[in-house]
Amino acid sequence: MFWQRKDLLGLRYLTPEEINLILDTAVPMKEIIGRKIKKTPTLRGRSMVTLFYENSTRTRSSFDLAGKFLSADTVGLTASSSSVAKGESLRDTGLTLTAMGVDVVVMRHPASGAAEYLAKCIPAAVINAGDGTHEHPTQALLDMFTIREKKGSMAGLKVVIVGDILHSRVARSNIWGLTKMGAEVRVVGPITLMPKDIEKMGVKVYHRLEDALEGADVVNVLRIQLERQQQGLFPSLREYSRLYGINQKRLELTASDAIILHPGPMNRGVEIEHQVAYGNRSFINEQVTNGVAVRMALLYLLTGGEYHALSN
């Protein structure tokens, strides 16, 4: 199979075959990361700009390293350090970058749909690095890559997503991707942090954590955004932790070989207990490594690379 899309905007409209192509391509990319010399000339002469309108540590540095490991020329821009601070529109920013010859724009933006809008405005490939509460496709892909590495096929797995589902673009992308791959997705959290009609996305909804964890194969713990407490969406961090924090006792409800994931950054002692976060069932640090591999795969595919050329 060959990659045929100009952009990666979300997982909602990707096919299972396209998802597998990305994950398959990430396998040899991870091998590159494990080398002493982490460099391949694959994207020499190609250029990538990271355009971030929101703060980021993991996603931005991950894309930057992904580009560098493939020998692409990379430039990082933030809203505060660019003409955006002077009032330049997103469209004009994109057209300016295109005029400079950029091949790929990786963008994070607070507005849902911003990546899709930019993709319609410019000929360069656009990768959505998070748009509002809409999607965060590369985070979901690295989560799925980690699950596939540890569990094999995702079909039939019971995957629990815990936390603020309402505001989480990570949750949405994971739901779209995992359900396409045949997983049983369970979402659990306070009723005030659960979207209405989320069952229509093909998930099972729980409000009691213990029920959701019963027999789970994967537990993906979302970061609780502290500002939600100020908005009155849950009483206190202590109360949230009491009801929805992942601790050793609750972990015993899951399958004996269940794995723990977290997109980071963690609020240790709130959504996840220290011993669980650093226990032998946690693959949180490996998710970070896998994120670089998945983003390398996407840069390769979106610039015309073919998987079979890597596997030969």
From Swiss-Prot:
Residues given in the record as carbamoyl phosphate binding sites: R58, T59, R108, H136, Q139, G264, P265
Domain of life, per lineage: Bacteria
Positions bound to L-aspartate: K86, R169, R223
EC number(s) given by UniProt: 2.1.3.2
InterPro entries associated with the record: Asp/Orn_carbamoyltranf_P-bd, Asp/Orn_carbamoylTrfase, Asp/Orn_carbamoylTrfase_sf, Asp_carbamoyltransf, Asp_carbamoyltransf_Asp/Orn-bd
Family: Belongs to the aspartate/ornithine carbamoyltransferase superfamily. ATCase family.
This protein's record includes keyword Flavoprotein: no
GO cellular component, one term: cytosol
Name recorded for this polypeptide: Aspartate carbamoyltransferase catalytic subunit
Organism: Desulforamulus reducens (strain ATCC BAA-1160 / DSM 100696 / MI-1) (Desulfotomaculum reducens)
Lineage: Bacteria, Bacillati, Bacillota, Clostridia, Eubacteriales
Class of this enzyme: transferase
UniProt KW keywords: Pyrimidine biosynthesis, Transferase
Pathway: Pyrimidine metabolism; UMP biosynthesis via de novo pathway; (S)-dihydroorotate from bicarbonate: step 2/3
NCBIfam families associated with the record: asp_carb_tr, PRK00856.1
Catalytic activity: carbamoyl phosphate + L-aspartate = N-carbamoyl-L-aspartate + phosphate + H(+)
Subunit structure: Heterododecamer (2C3:3R2) of six catalytic PyrB chains organized as two trimers (C3), and six regulatory PyrI chains organized as three dimers (R2).
GO biological process annotation, one example: amino acid metabolic process
Role this protein plays: Catalyzes the condensation of carbamoyl phosphate and aspartate to form carbamoyl aspartate and inorganic phosphate, the committed step in the de novo pyrimidine nucleotide biosynthesis pathway.
Gene name per UniProt: pyrB
GO terms of molecular function: amino acid binding; aspartate carbamoyltransferase activity
